[in-house]
Amino acid sequence: MRMNKQIVVTDWIKEKPRLGSFLKLTLTSDERKILRGKRLTDCDQEIILQLPRNGKLNDGDILSTNESNFYVEIIAKTEDLIEISSNSKNELIKTAYHLGNRHVEVEIEEDILLTKSDYVIENMLKNFKVDIVNTQKKFSPEKGAHSHD
């Protein structure tokens, strides 16, 4: 659904409304960090993000707009990632340490680490006792120690 009016996105809402129109906005993990500026929704509707500067957009977030019955739903885009696993928790922890030491964004799951596909990082990982697999998934990295959200 497209509107001719300018749609301004102003805030997060806690619960998905039962009524109203939803625009989907699919973004990468990097794009989800930027809370201000023009974007095109999945149906090519231009919107303007004017969100409070704290925080980050997450997969499934619902945002309110200047139009009372219009909402924007955030969808995390599938990205090229490296999936890192090991039979040894200790090796996985060491690997996470070295990735963090290089300021590489990492998503931590139960038995795997995920990071963005990068040939330099992939070559570094070959020096560890871990298994690496190229995959495509939604990416939600951990907040950094110096994060402002």
Curated annotation (Swiss-Prot):
Q: Which GO terms describe its cellular component?
A: cytoplasm
- Chief subcellular location equals cytoplasm
Job of this protein? Involved in urease metallocenter assembly. Binds nickel. Probably functions as a nickel donor during metallocenter assembly.
Q: Cytoplasm: is it a keyword of this entry?
A: yes
Q: Which UniProt keywords apply?
A: Chaperone, Cytoplasm, Nickel, Nickel insertion
Q: Which Pfam families match?
A: UreE_C, UreE_N
Q: Quote the protein name from its UniProt record.
A: Urease accessory protein UreE
Per the UniProt record, the lineage of the source organism begins with: Bacteria, Bacillati, Cyanobacteriota, Cyanophyceae, Synechococcales
User: So what family is this one in?
Assistant: Belongs to the UreE family.
Under the heading InterPro entries, the entry gives: UreE, UreE_C_dom, UreE_N, UreE_N_sf
